[in-house]
Curated annotation (Swiss-Prot):
This is Beta-ketoacyl-[acyl-carrier-protein] synthase III. GO terms for cellular component: cytoplasm. The lineage of its organism: Bacteria, Bacillati, Bacillota, Clostridia, Eubacteriales. SUPFAM superfamilies: Thiolase-like. It comes from the Bacteria. It catalyses: malonyl-[ACP] + acetyl-CoA + H(+) = 3-oxobutanoyl-[ACP] + CO2 + CoA. Keywords: Acyltransferase, Cytoplasm, Fatty acid biosynthesis, Fatty acid metabolism, Lipid biosynthesis, Lipid metabolism, Multifunctional enzyme, Transferase. Gene3D superfamilies: 3.40.47.10. It comes from Clostridium botulinum (strain Langeland / NCTC 10281 / Type F). One of its GO terms (molecular function) is beta-ketoacyl-acyl-carrier-protein synthase III activity.
Length: 326
């Protein structure tokens, strides 16, 4: 049976930067309060770019990076909890924009774990069918579901999209997954139905029960436990020692979660790649944005061993072991 490898990455973030200092003018907070509790310095907020646009731009970059044509794609999966429409799906809209006429397209909703779930679904579909190449996108426009009057949540989130292209290959690539869900604790991170035009500068607000709501302490506890379980499970399946792993690319939610996880695993914090200081929490987009940033910076070399790990609303979690092949 063929192996599956990552052959290209791409990303898009809005140009509009919202700093901690700006947020301190609209809610009772400060740069020091946000920075010391989250590690976030700024985030990108959409000014007209919708989810489809950001997803499409990240897809175009990934296609170029993979040196393929859009009509080479057999599958497009978009992970998002902030679609522009219920139908057509974001994936079908991306298909239209990039001209991927041969692709099967659908969306999934698994919050911050969505990109990992998308990778696992795509790998299964590629291995068990005639399909050869898949585009997986994580894209979020979280600013439209953030309560800009709640200092505990509005400081955390940003907008953006990231993408990866998978292909059947003879090389060693994507090896093992570990994923799961715990709906019994779903009430700790929720969001209701979306409505348009919710920005930090406008009075057009969502109903309060339709914003992102989070029990921070419970999510912190869940995240550290899920990260530790996932990484240890992947180590067991692959027989990798953490010393062999070049990087762990986790969901970019909070620097403290990453620091606590590193301590539990008895490994250095620097093994965890972090860019949340620039982008905040972009949910399903955070891992592929980080992966593309690392690829562009030349931080990953062929045959490097990496682990991707995510956690989020649902509650959901998942991870994957990859031997880098670009």
């Amino acid at each position: 049976m063929s192996n599956i490898s990552v052959i290209g990455t791409g990303s898009y973030v809005p140009n509009n930067i919202i700093t901690n200092d700006f947020l301190s003018t609209i809610v009772d907070t400060s740069d020091e309060w946000i920075r010391t509790r989250t590690g976030i310095l700024e985030r990108r907020i959409s000014k007209g770019e919708n989810t489809i646009y950001m997803a499409t731009e990240s897809a175009k970059e990934a296609i170029k990076n993979a040196n393929i044509e859009a009509n080479d794609l057999d599958l497009i999966i978009v992970a998002t909890l902030t679609p522009d429409n219920f139908m057509p799906s974001t994936a079908c809209s991306v298909q239209k924009e990039i001209g991927a006429i041969n692709a099967l397209c659908f969306d999934i909703s698994a919050a911050c774990s969505g990109f990992i779930y998308g990778l696992e679904i795509a790998c299964s579909m590629l291995k068990n069918s005639f399909r050869n190449k898949a585009l997986i996108i994580g894209a979020e426009n979280l600013s439209k579901i953030v309560d800009w009057e709640d200092r505990n949540t509005c400081v955390l989130f940003g907008d953006g999209a990231g993408a990866a292209i998978l292909s059947k290959t003879k090389e060693e690539g994507i090896l093992e997954f570990h994923s799961g869900s715990n709906g019994l604790k779903g009430e700790h991170l929720t969001c209701g139905v979306l409505k348009a035009n919710n920005t930090p500068n406008k009075n057009d607000r969502l109903e309060k029960n339709n914003f992102i709501k989070m029990n921070g302490k419970e999510i912190f506890r869940f995240a550290v436990g899920a990260m530790n379980e996932t990484i240890c499970n992947i180590q067991e399946k692959t027989k990798w020692d953490l010393n062999e792993v070049k990087y762990i690319i986790s969901h970019q939610a909070n620097s403290r979660i990453i620091e606590y996880t590193a301590k539990k695993l008895n490994t250095e914090k620097d093994k965890f790649y972090m860019n949340l200081d620039k982008y905040g929490n972009t949910s399903a987009a955070s891992i592929p944005i980080a992966l593309d940033e690392m690829n562009k910076r030349g931080l990953l070399n062929k045959q490097d061993k990496i682990i991707l790990v995510g956690f989020g609303g649902g509650l959901t979690f998942g991870g994957v072991a990859i031997v880098w092949s670009i």
